[in-house]
Amino acid sequence: MIINLADVEQLSIKAESVDFQYDMYKKVCEKFTDFEQSVLWQCMEAKKNEALHKHLNEIIKKHLTKSPYQLYRGISKSTKELIKDLQVGEVFSTNRVDSFTTSLHTACSFSYAEYFTETILRLKTDKAFNYSDHISDIILSSPNTEFKYTYEDTDGLDSERTDNLMMIVREQEWMIPIGKYKITSISKEKLHDSFGTFKVYDIEVVE
């Protein structure tokens, strides 16, 4: 389900209904087993487990769809170290499932404020796994017992479900299976008014 940020709270309220949850669960189960749903759920946290990447890779390869032409990734220090000496035309692999976003602001925020690398991967691709869409369905299909309620929930709104959906909708995450990337250009660019200059690696998937 494609969700707009403005619709999150209303959908969260609807998702408190057992009937709504069951209808969404049937929809989700047409695509993913319970185990696969569990793997995707764990990806809302940092994906540091090698076994998780193995299972995740198998899942997303079965569900690749047409993606936006351009995706972005603000890279970690380990990835920056991996590619720092590479030149245009060279190939590299992170040996893991990589998350990208359609949101340039999100990618810049991760690179600038979380990883402190000021380095962006800009990927041109025609297919990827729409994690944001699929995990939104899973969140909406989940029973109320999966989420914490807070004392501020005076209207019965499940704030943790809402918070999770807000995060997912803002990040607009897409995933690329484990594989190789080819560097097509390297540049210094000011990508967003809220940030300074970034080192940008334009890349493409090597089939």
From Swiss-Prot:
**Where primarily located?**
virion
What's the reported outcome of changing E173A? Complete loss of enzymatic activity in vitro
| Keywords assigned | Glycosyltransferase, Transferase, Virion
Location in or out of the cell = Virion
Q: Which SUPFAM superfamilies match?
A: ADP-ribosylation
> What does the UniProt function comment say about this protein?
ADP-ribosyltransferase that regulates transcription by ADP-ribosylation of host ribosomal protein S1. Additional identified targets include proteins involved in either translation or cellular metabolism such as elongation factor-Tu or trigger factor. Also reprograms the host's gene-expression system by RNAylating host ribosomal protein S1. ModB can attach NAD-capped RNAs to target proteins post-transcriptionally resulting in covalent RNA-protein conjugates.
This chain's protein is named NAD--protein ADP-ribosyltransferase modB
Organism annotation: Enterobacteria phage T4
The taxonomy runs:
Viruses, Duplodnaviria, Heunggongvirae, Uroviricota, Caudoviricetes
